[in-house]
């Protein structure tokens, strides 16, 4: 059973289920070299993802467009904050080159927040989708966008380019937003996801939250209900891991049994797909999950 009690993680040793092997393989090195040669950023490195070794060894990577400097300063995130670089107009082409050379069946594109841009970078997302469609027409495309706060209908620019999956992470429960995600608004994120689904119901919508930040079980279940009300198809739940001493503390380490509980409840609430485990991240096994999403939708139609 899942407990509401938050056990402090101060001075706690990271449990065995959160330990991963250091990245080291020929495939990992070749993926790393290609990404560097094309001058692309990845959230895998910038956000210090624990799954980088496994994913890059399989030639899977989540590309981060619009630079590596974010205009927000979320308490959980390892991406640098400051004044962003100018938008690189050649980046969509280089990204399409990487997708083609890696032979990707599924690509995930994310970005830093770009509050300095009039559309938050939405048109750049759309260009990336268009270039990939032209050069790798069989590759499925998943976007993980910012919230486009105060950028009127910027999400629609991305949705019109017709990604296969539109992901926007809710990140945490409403009561922790001021502490964890102060530059964002919970209901703005919910509305974005719902508007995408209303605009084009064929686009799979996806969102994720981190646990272990101080939330209660009841709050997590309420987020599930809110996301289902917004017609979100796919939910991911993973353990928050503190990137450095300057980031927000881990409240507790959530056990694998608790993740199983959350997954079971989420499925009962009607999500087409649920991925809930300590090491789950938004784009972890994204290609496999996309294929399963398509199968689940077909089963529901039949």
UniProtKB/Swiss-Prot annotation:
Pathway: Protein modification; protein lipoylation via endogenous pathway; protein N(6)-(lipoyl)lysine from octanoyl-[acyl-carrier-protein]: step 2/2. CDD domains: Radical_SAM. It comes from the Bacteria. One of its GO terms (cellular component) is cytoplasm. The keyword S-adenosyl-L-methionine applies. Residues 56-272 form the Radical SAM core domain. GO terms for molecular function: 4 iron, 4 sulfur cluster binding; lipoate synthase activity; metal ion binding. It catalyses: [[Fe-S] cluster scaffold protein carrying a second [4Fe-4S](2+) cluster] + N(6)-octanoyl-L-lysyl-[protein] + 2 oxidized [2Fe-2S]-[ferredoxin] + 2 S-adenosyl-L-methionine + 4 H(+) = [[Fe-S] cluster scaffold protein] + N(6)-[(R)-dihydrolipoyl]-L-lysyl-[protein] + 4 Fe(3+) + 2 hydrogen sulfide + 2 5'-deoxyadenosine + 2 L-methionine + 2 reduced [2Fe-2S]-[ferredoxin]. Binds 2 [4Fe-4S] clusters per subunit. One cluster is coordinated with 3 cysteines and an exchangeable S-adenosyl-L-methionine. HAMAP family: Lipoyl_synth (MF_00206). This is Lipoyl synthase. The lineage of its organism: Bacteria, Pseudomonadati, Pseudomonadota, Alphaproteobacteria, Rickettsiales.
């Amino acid at each position: 059973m899942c407990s509401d009690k938050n056990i402090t993680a101060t001075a706690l040793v990271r449990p065995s289920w959160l330990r991963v092997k250091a990245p080291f393989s020929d495939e990992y090195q070749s993926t790393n070299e290609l990404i560097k040669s094309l001058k692309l950023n990845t959230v895998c490195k910038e956000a210090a993802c624990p799954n980088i070794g496994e994913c890059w060894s399989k030639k899977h990577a989540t590309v981060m467009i619009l630079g590596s400097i974010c205009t927000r300063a979320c308490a959980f995130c390892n991406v640098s904050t400051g004044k962003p670089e100018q938008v690189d107009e050649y980046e969509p082409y280089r990204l399409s080159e990487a997708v083609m050379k890696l032979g990707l069946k599924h690509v995930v594109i994310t970005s830093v927040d770009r509050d300095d841009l009039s559309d938050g970078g939405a048109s750049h997302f759309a260009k990336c989708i268009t270039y990939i469609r032209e050069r790798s027409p069989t590759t499925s495309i998943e976007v993980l966008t910012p919230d486009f706060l105060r950028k009127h209908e910027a999400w629609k620019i991305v949705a019109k380019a017709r990604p296969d999956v539109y992901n926007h992470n809710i990140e945490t429960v409403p009561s922790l937003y001021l502490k964890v995600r102060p530059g964002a608004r919970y209901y703005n994120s919910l509305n974005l996801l719902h508007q995408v689904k209303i605009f084009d119901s064929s686009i799979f919508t996806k969102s994720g939250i981190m646990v272990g930040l101080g939330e209660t079980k009841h709050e997590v279940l309420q987020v599930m209900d809110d996301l289902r009300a917004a017609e979100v198809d796919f939910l991911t739940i993973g353990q928050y891991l503190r990137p450095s001493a300057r980031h927000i503390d881990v409240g507790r380490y959530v056990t694998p049994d608790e993740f199983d509980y959350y997954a079971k409840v989420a499925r009962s609430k009607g999500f087409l797909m649920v991925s809930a485990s300590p090491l789950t991240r938004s784009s972890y096994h994204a290609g496999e999950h996309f294929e399963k999403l398509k199968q689940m939708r077909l089963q529901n139609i039949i």
